[in-house]
Amino acid sequence: MAGSQLKRLRATLKAHGLTGQTNVKKSKNRKTSKEYDHEEKARVVSAIREQFNPFDVKANRSKLHAAGAGDAKVAVGKPGISKQIGEEQRLRFHESKKAQKNRAGGLIDKRFGERNKHMTAEEIMLERFTKERQAQSRQSKKSLFNLDDEEDDGDASGALTHFGKPLASDFEDGDLGVGMAGALGPKRGLADDEMEPEVPKKKTKAEVMKEVIAKSKFYKHERQKAREQMEEEIDQLDDEFEGIMSELRAAPRARTNPVESKPSQELEYDQKVRELCLDRRAAPADRVKTDEEMKQEREEKLKKLELDRVNRMNGLVDGEDAQGVEDLDNGFWEAEDSDAGEYGEYMEAIADSDDDLKFENEPETAEPTGTSHKQKKIAALPCPITHAELMDVLTAYQLEEQPHVVKNIIKAYQPKLAEGNKEKLDKFSGVLLHHILFLSSSDYASQADVIVEVQNSLISILKLMSEKYNQALSEACRQVVTEIQQRFKAQHYLGLKPSDLVFFSLVGYIFSTSDHYHLVVTPCCILLGEFLEQIKLTDYERLIFVAIAANICVRYQRISRRHVPELAYFLKRALASLLPFSTENSQAFNIRLDSDKLSLSKTLVLEDIEPTLKLRFLFLKEYDDSVQAQLLVNLLSTLDACVSQLWKGVSAFPELTQPFKPLLSAFASSYPTFAKPQQIMERMERISNLQQHFPLTLQNHKPAAIPSYMPKFEDNFNPEKKSYDPDRTRNDINKMKAQLKKERKLTMKELRKDTKFEARQKIEEQRKHADDYKAKMARIVNQISTEEGADKNKYEKEKRLRAGKR
C-alpha cells in the first residue's frame, strides 16, 4: 500500500537531493556548485510541485481515441496560471487607465448654442450678443490704462491727477526730436557733417519706454483733434439743416410731362394679353365613350358593388375599405358625374341642378299658394336645425305643399352656393327624419291618402339625401333607436308609437340590411327581436303591431337569410292565439298563450284578402272581421316567406317547421275554402324531401404511418474534414463565418471578464475607501477621547487639590 501524500513528497525531495543530510564532508576532488545548479534546482522543484498538485493541470481528453495511440501527445493546459496571468494583465491596464484618468488632453467646444437642440435661433443670437458685450466690458476694464487705446472720451476719468487736480501735459514737439537741427544752428550741422560716423549707442529700457510714451501721446492727440473737428462740422450741419430744408421746399418743382394716353385699340390689346396670361390652361377632355363601353362600365360597377355587398354580408371587409354608415367623404360633392350606385341618377338632383327634385312615379305637385310673393318667400326660406323650426316654416303652407317646400330648402342651401351649407343640410336630414316620424304618429284617418302621399314624397327626398349625408343621418337614426329602447324598457308596449314601425321601415329602405355588422341596422334588429319576444299578445292592437314588426324583420333578412329565433317564436304564439278553438284545445300544441280572447270566428271570409296590414289599423278602437281576416292572412304570408326564403337552406329545417304543421292543419280544417295553410304545408314537405339530414359523426381520418429514414453515409469519410460541400466558394464563406463566430464568442467572453474585473476593482476601491474613512474617524474619535480623558484627569486632580486645601 502506497504511503501518504506527505511521505511520498519527502521521498521525492530526498531522491532529487533537495532534502536530507547537508553537513556531509565534501570531497576535495569534487567541484563546487555554480549558478547553474540553482536554475536546475528551481526547475526540479517546479516539476515536483506540478506532480503533487494535479488540480492546476488540465488535459484535454481525446474524443476519437484510436487503437495503438497510447503514446500520443495530449494537449495540456494550466487554467490557474492562465487566469492569474490574465488577472495581472488586467490589473496593470487598470492601474495605467486609473493613472491617466482626468489627465488626457482634448479639445473642448466652448461655442455656445452650436449643438444645443433645445435653443432656437433667436435664443442663440441673444446668447451670443450677451457674451460679446461681456467680453467687450472685460476688455474695456483691462484697457483702462492702456496707452495704445484709441478710444478717449476726453474727460478726466483716465487722466493723471495730483490732489484731485489734473496735471498739465508735458508733451512738446521737441520730445520727438522735431526742430532739433534748427535749435542747434548751422554749426552743429557742419559739425555733424565733418564728424565721422560712429557706432549708434544702444538705448536703455527707460529711453525706449519714454519714446514709446511720447509717440503714443502724439498719435492720441492727433486723433482727438480729428474727432473734435468732425464733431464741430456735424454740429454746424445740424444748425444749418432746417434752413437748407426750407429752401428746398420753397424751390419750384419741375413739371413732369403728362403720360400720353394710348389709343383704345392698344388698351384693348393689352387687356387681352393680361387675360391670356392669367387664364389657366384647359385640361384635356375625355373622349366620348361608345354605348358598348358605357354598358360594360356599368356592368363592371354593378358587379363590384354586388361583390362589396357580399363581402360586407360575410364580414370579410376591412375597416379601411368598407363604405359603411360612418364613412362620409369630405370631397363627396366634388365627385365625378357618373352614376353612384343604385340611386346614382338622383345624386345630381340636389347638388348640381337648379331644377326641382324629380322622383319616379311622382305626380307634379302644385306651387305653394299660401303667399302672394312666391319666389321671394322661397329665396328667404331658412334652413331648420330642429323639428320645431321646421314646423314653424311649414305652418304657412298646406299639407300637400310640404314636399315642395323641403325641396326648395335643399336647393337654396346647396353646398356649392355658400360655405357652411353642407353642415346645415347634415342637420336638416335628421330634422326631415323626425318630421316623417311626426306625420306617422298622428291620427290621419280623415285624410289618409294625402298624408301617405306626402310621406312617400318626403321619404324619397330623405333617400336622396342619405346618399350624400350618410354620417349625419346615421347618427340621427342611432339617437332614435336609443330613444325607442329607453321607452320600451320603461313602459314596455305602452311606450311604443306607430311611428316606431315607420322608422324601422325607413332604416330598411335607406341602409343596407345584409351587412354582417351595421351601425344602424344591427341595433334595429336587436330591438325588433325584443319586440317579437317580450310584447304580450293580449289584444288585436298589440298583435297587429308585432305582426308589422315581424314583416319588417323578414324584409331585413331577405338577402342575408339569417335565422331569427324570435321570429319563429312569435309566429307560433300568434297563430295559436288566433285558432278558432277554446283554451283547452290550444294547450294541446304546448304553447303558452297570453290571452284567450283573440280566437277568430269560423265564419270569417278569407278569400281574396290582401295580406298587407296598414298602419292606420293601430288607431282603430274596434276590429271587425275584415281586419281580423287581414291579420291572419298577413301572419300566414309571413310564415310562407320564412319557409321559402329564410329557412329553406337551413340544415335544421325539419325541426323549425315541425311545430307549425299542427297549427296549419287546424287552420285548414277550420277554413276548408282557404287554401293558404295547405299550400304552406305542401311547400314544407317538398323542401323536407329535398334535404338530407344526417346525424353528426366524427371525422374518419386515415391512420398516418410512422416515417422511417435510412441513415446517411459518406463514401469518402474523413474525420479531419468538417464540410463536404463541393462548392469551394461557399465552403470558404462558411469557414469564414465559423471563424468569425468563434472570434466573436471569444471577444464577448473577454469583455465579460473585463467587466467583472472592473466591477471587482470598483467594489475593492469602495471597500478600501470605506475602511480608510472608518479608520480615520476612529483615530479622530480616539484622539478626542484621549484629550478629553486628559482634561478630565487634570480637572479631577485640581478638584482634589482644592478639596485638600480646605
Swiss-Prot record:
Q: Which UniProt keywords apply?
A: Nucleus, Ribosome biogenesis, rRNA processing
Q: Name one GO molecular function term.
A: U3 snoRNA binding
Q: Which domain of life is it from?
A: Eukaryota
Q: Got any disulfides in this one, which pairs? A: none
Q: Where is the composition biased (Basic and acidic residues)?
A: 32-41, 198-207, 789-806
Q: Which GO terms describe its cellular component?
A: Noc4p-Nop14p complex; nucleolus; small-subunit processome
Task: Name one process (GO BP) from the record.
Answer: endonucleolytic cleavage to generate mature 5'-end of SSU-rRNA from (SSU-rRNA, 5.8S rRNA, LSU-rRNA)
Quick one: where's region Disordered? 1-41, 92-114, 130-207, 249-271, 787-806
Tell me the leader sequence span.
none
**InterPro entries (UniProt xref):** Nop14 (IPR007276)
Which subcellular locations apply to this protein? Nucleus, Nucleolus
- Membership in a protein family: Belongs to the NOP14 family.
Reported function: Involved in nucleolar processing of pre-18S ribosomal RNA. Has a role in the nuclear export of 40S pre-ribosomal subunit to the cytoplasm.
What is the annotated quaternary arrangement, including any partners?
Component of the ribosomal small subunit (SSU) processome.
Protein name, as recorded: Probable nucleolar complex protein 14
Organism (species): Eremothecium gossypii (strain ATCC 10895 / CBS 109.51 / FGSC 9923 / NRRL Y-1056)
